[in-house]
Amino acid sequence: MTRRPTIAIADLSIVAPTGVKLVAGLTLSVDAGEVLLVVGPSGSGKTTLIRLLCGLLDRAGGWQVRGTLTHPGGQIDLAHQDSTIGGLVFQNHALFDDLSAGENLRIVADHRPAAATFQLAATVGTMLGDIDPAQPVSACSGGQRQRLAIARTLLSDPVLLLFDEPNAGLDIRASRWLAETIRELCRESGKPAIIVAHHLDDFITLADRVLLLDPATATLREVPIDRSAIEAAMLATEPGVAAATPELERTTPGAAASPAANPWTRPLPRRSRAWWFLRYLREYLWLLFAAPSMLLYIALGSAIVGFVTIWFGFNYHSFGGYLRAVLHDETLEGLGFLLTMVAVPFNTCLLLVARNSAIIAADLGNRVSGMQMQAMKNLHLPGRGYIVASILISLVIGSLVLVAAALVAAFCTSLLTWMYLFPGQPTEYWQENFFRKLADRHELVSDLGWVALKVVASALLGGGTALLIGLRSRRSASGVTQLIASAIIGGVSLTLLVHAVLMLLQF
């Protein structure tokens, strides 16, 4: 097989936001199919280096980078451009937990040229024979999740494979299998690989070179491929710290299925980008609006508003007594208009924004903290576009539909309450007076337009606030609670402001 040309890094310097120089004047070449093992003490910049090579270093965080990266497709100025050649297998795997095991790979394959994914299909199939494509990734073992992550990265067809602590949490057997798999993949595909690891035993034998990132000199220097020599070099850079040893866990890779029984080898029709967008749209429509709990939540809130408006409107208005019957028609007319144009839309928007802001912030916060958004970027998937567009469209459609449903629920309870207060009266009498101010078709269209404007503006501003908060969150699961609180406060505050301003303009 024809191997790809060498990848070359020239004059690379990396300075952390704290001012610490992690790399200074690095020049490095990586041959096709070569496996490099990068070692060094914690905090020396190993993970920063591979995040730079895969285009995921946060430039807005104050990092200073200089250098060039030459690859088969051209040259990248790392001072101003993100690298697009590195495919990263994340330490926590960063699998998409809302997709099945099969969909995690299929979404990548469907966004790549058919020829590229076809050439890699056989290799991927042999790695995953014991995994049911339909099973949730949460049901996969640690070893299975690792193999899914590697297979998914392979399907994106990167020029350079990058592994961040790939054997963390694996037992000896699983680690050895992983090392052999990486070595074989590099030989067969001609793709070079850079591995960052603290647990060295299984990777020493497969590495073509071992490079030590020395924080004292900010250089990357080659050391002998020998455990004792590597340990001595690491101890010299960080005196008093013992070298890491492999962790043991009871996680083993499953045996590969026979080709005839392997579900991953069956050809599947390609799905379009429109199909994947509709899949995310369906997911968020259900999550934000169509779930039974949501429907019950809105129905209950609207039913209470309908009851309270009629009950207190007739029993506790300023006239009371016998005037309740005398002023019945005018009171019912005003209450019907109030319910339709103000009370129900306002109450429903508050309920929707509060609930959905929490859901959106939690969902995106978990995606960010679980590295799923970064994985989408690294795999060249338009995931952010799919998710943001699906959420915003769901908010508009769902809010309008649920406000309409809420009006129906409020009308029903208001009718039942009225029938209790005025027994023996025909329902036609309620209908005639309740909707009297809405009888003029021209005014009705205008008034409903104002209602729709309030609903859509509340949904977009509330949801947009939750989106911004969720996507800009720190990569920490512990901060999700704060995200939710901030999203609810921001969304509800904007909803109150929107309704106040638009009601003043309307009336």
Can you say where each PLM-predicted feature lies in the sequence?
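Catalytic Walker B motif of ABC-type/P-loop ATPase nucleotide-binding domains
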Residues: 161-164
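Conserved beta-strand-loop-alpha-helix hinge in the C-terminal portion
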Residues: 216-245
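Q-loop/switch helix immediately C-terminal to the Walker
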Residues: 92, 98-114
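Helix-to-loop junction immediately C-terminal to a conserved catalytic motif
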Residues: 54
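Hydrophobic anchor residue at the start of the ABC signature
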Residues: 150
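ABC ATPase NBD coupling module
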Residues: 73-87
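Conserved ABC ATPase signature
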Residues: 136-140
